[in-house]
Amino acid sequence: MDDSTIVAGRLADMRIARFSHNDVPQYAFVQTDESDGKDYLVALEGHPLAGAGVKPTGERFPVDGDGIRLLSPVIPSKVYGLAKNYEAHAQFMHEAGHSDIKHAPEDMVIFSKPSTSVIGPDDPIVIPSYSNDMNFEPEVAVVMGRIAKNVTVEQAMDYVLGFTCVNDVTLRDLQGLDPMWTRAKGFDTSCPLGPWIVTRDDLDWKDAKISFTLNGEDVELASGTTANLIHGIPEQIAAISSFTTLLPGDVILTGTPNASGHLDPGDEAIVHAEGIGSLRNVVVRG
């Protein structure tokens, strides 16, 4: 990679990470070194979502190097999500006794999370003291790259920077108490994102495989693919941008594909999305 400036709108076929080196946060491109097969962070000057563009600083660090910590790949101003956007998840919620509705609703069910709910890879997910039933929900998240307002379905993907993994952590025992799900889905640490952003053209977002690992064991009933989304990603962007302005860095949680499950203190939760990577967090009691 040369030192020329890359403008945000032209970012393609890349992985974009946000990391700290000795507690100094910065952005990087993630590259795999063919000589050893390891991932390296190519540090950047500038912000990937800023109009001025970015360019390599000349520094390179191993992703797992000393003093390196991956952060949430963006700090969104807004996070929106879609509930019951897969028929399998809607049926699971009904069979588990969490919903009176057996099938997915015809209209989109959109909720929000505050920006303070966002954490990064390896950050702890904290069970609030007022909950005893916290659940994982593995998903693919959309990261916006341009200001989007009243965009059409046909235009929608032009406004996307890329995709990342997300765990839409939910307090099931509070979800039925608040119609807006504010406490159930908006508590601090309820939105782990990472490990990085894969740019739009470098992911088969129409058929991205999603899976989940709990304490080293694959949870087969939690797996699925974005091919089974009821409301597709362009439709989600068009719908949300019809009532609010989406800014660069804003995040949309596209839906969990199948079953979810309980999390206990000490659990290791890993969301995996084919073509993106793995997002790991450990659960602690607050």
What is each stretch, according to the model?
Residues 2-104, 108, 201-203, 211, ...:
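N-terminal non-catalytic cap/leader segment that marks the start of a structured domain
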Residues 6, 69-71, 98-101, 125-134, ...:
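A generic local secondary-structure boundary/capping motif
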Residues 59-63, 69-72, 89, 170-286:
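Catalytic-pocket segment enriched in acidic/His residues
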Residues 75, 120, 135-137, 247, ...:
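Residue-level recognition of short, solvent-exposed, well-ordered loop/turn junctions
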Residues 85, 144-147, 151-166:
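RNA pseudouridine synthases
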Residues 92-93, 121-124, 129-130, 151-156, ...:
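A short secondary-structure junction signal
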Residues 98-120, 136, 270-274:
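Structural signature of FAD isoalloxazine-binding scaffolds in flavoprotein oxidoreductases
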Residues 116-141:
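A structural-propensity feature for long, helix-poor, extended segments
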